[in-house]
Structures are given as structure tokens and as C-alpha cells.
């Protein structure tokens, strides 16, 4: 399942998840693209301390970017 497709449907796939608006899905997709382009996210399958350090050094609101990566990793399971 593609990342954007997962984001649009994750509320149906996982209990307790809320439906995302289309604009939010686009924002998550853009965040992921930018993190990959800048070499912050390198395709890791787990979020470790090193990745969190790279995120916190680059982004003030780094937890939003961490959530983006978590959603991306989760999408690989569908």
C-alpha cells in the first residue's frame, strides 16, 4: 500500500486512529519527501536514538516528523 493511500485509510485499518483530511495527508507526504531529500530519514525500519537526534537537530517541532516516519513504517505493513 502506498504511503498516501495508507494515510487516507489508516482510520479503517487501525482502531483508535482518526481520519486525516486530504491537506494533512499532503503535509505528511511532503515532510517525508523533504526528510529523505535532506538525508535525515534513510529508510530505517525502526526509530532509534540516532534518528531522533537528527530530527531534533533539524526541526523545532521534531515530534511531528517522528510521527510521519512512524506512519511511513506502519504503512509498509499493509
What residue spans do the PLM features occupy?
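N-terminal DNA-binding module of tyrosine recombinases/phage integrases
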Residues: 1-8, 74-78
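Positively charged, polyanion-binding regions of nucleic-acid-associated proteins
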Residues: 8-16
Amino acid at each position: 500500500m502506498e504511503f498516501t493511500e495508507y494515510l487516507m485509510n489508516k482510520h479503517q485499518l487501525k482502531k483508535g486512529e482518526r481520519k486525516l483530511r486530504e491537506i494533512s495527508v499532503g503535509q505528511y507526504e511532503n515532510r517525508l519527501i523533504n526528510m529523505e531529500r535532506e538525508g535525515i530519514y534513510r529508510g530505517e525500519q525502526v526509530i532509534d536514538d540516532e534518528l531522533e537526534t537528527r530530527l531534533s537537530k533539524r526541526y523545532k517541532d521534531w515530534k511531528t516528523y517522528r510521527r510521519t516516519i512512524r506512519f511511513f513504517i506502519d504503512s509498509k505493513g499493509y
